Curated annotation (Swiss-Prot):
Residues 235-283, 294-307, 430-443 have a biased composition (Basic and acidic residues). Residues 1-37, 235-307, 402-443 are annotated as: Disordered. GO terms for biological process: mRNA splicing, via spliceosome. It is found in: Nucleus. Associated with the spliceosome. This is Pre-mRNA-processing protein 45. Involved in pre-mRNA splicing. Its main location: nucleus. The lineage of its organism: Eukaryota, Fungi, Dikarya, Ascomycota, Saccharomycotina. Belongs to the SNW family. It comes from the Eukaryota. GO terms for cellular component: spliceosomal complex.
Amino acid sequence: MNSAPFSTLLPPPKKESSPTVASAHQSPENQGDEPVAGIVFDSLQPDGIPNVSFQDFIPIRQRDFNMEIPLPSKQDIEQTFQRTKAYFDKLLNNKPATNSRPSTDARSGKGNYIEYKTTDALTNKSTSRIIKIVDHVADPLQPSQIKRKKVVAPPTDEPVAPILHSATEKLTKEQREQWRIPSAVSNWKNPNGYAIDLEKRIAIDGRYNREGTAIPAVNEKLLELTNALEEAESKAREEVRNRAEARKQEAEQQVRLKEDKLRELAQRSREERQRKRRQPIDHEEYDESAIIRQTERNEKRDQMKNDMRLSKLSTADRLRVLAHAQGRDVSEKIILGAAKPSEVPDVHYDSRLLTKGAGTAVPGAPEQVYDGPLFAQNAMDRLYKPARFTGPENDALDILSKMTSEQRFEDQDPGTSVDQQQTSPGMQKSDAKQDSEHDLKRT
């Protein structure tokens, strides 16, 4: 490692401020030789201007890394001690004597005494106490704890001085015309479709007023054209208003005529009904063939309505109605193949899954463990069984005699006819409904 100082790598200074520093920077062979350029330069420098070189900005430790700085001497240490002690003594002497000796003051009894009197509100007796006030013990070297607040100047009651200025003068008509700026009117765009006067279009055009001192003169023909356009527009608006009014009156007239016509038709129909109500009905006027045709028409209409009603029913209801029409015995459980088995509430499985072991006796199935189905009886109970004609004592002749002599529907009303007994209650209800509909249509 190079032990040469850092300052030796730099060019030598032209002039050193102190001889000790200059001797430290100069090499031994060059000591005593002062450069001529430095002398001439120093002689040319004016008085009062310090001579600063680059060497002055280098720290002392970097100028010579092997330089030893001597420790302070005993005399310097003693001077610093005496100066510090004198400052602290000055601080302690400025404090009150009570702060420096609090214990002795308390023992000696120094302090201020005051008499404190109190009066009882109930007994109205006064008691006095003597209180001794002693200064609080404080550190003399502790900084002051009193917060210095900024002194705010009190508000002054002086009124605010008004700003005096001359009153505004009213502009004359000529000045207002000079300051008037016409509104910008485009000759190409008019999105809102406003009708703009020609005077405003000319006022914004600078070609007619190059000097800018007066309003451009408008030709009389332009004024006539503007007036003609306004008059034509007013006439067109008046015509549109008249046509709208005529159209409105015509519509009101048509509505009034329709109302009168409807009122007249209603009056005619009312008079016709009253006339027919007064005249007696002559049955001989009706032709027998007309009565037959009307009867056939009514029967055909009833048949079409019945077919329409049956087409809207479900399959089971349609089969039930067909069975009633044919006079067959139909129960609630089975209707021509549309079976609706009764549900067993405690069975929540399919018995077909448990009846696959029915053929256990068949040879060739030795892996079958059970000899019969498990829940076969429940499946048999769910099958349809007729409630009548069951038992060994019923033979074919007894069954036939019961079927021929049985009365299928009992009479609940003694005034009902035989035809009503042979029909079901549902069919009677539908026939009554159809009869009521025919009566309404005839009326």
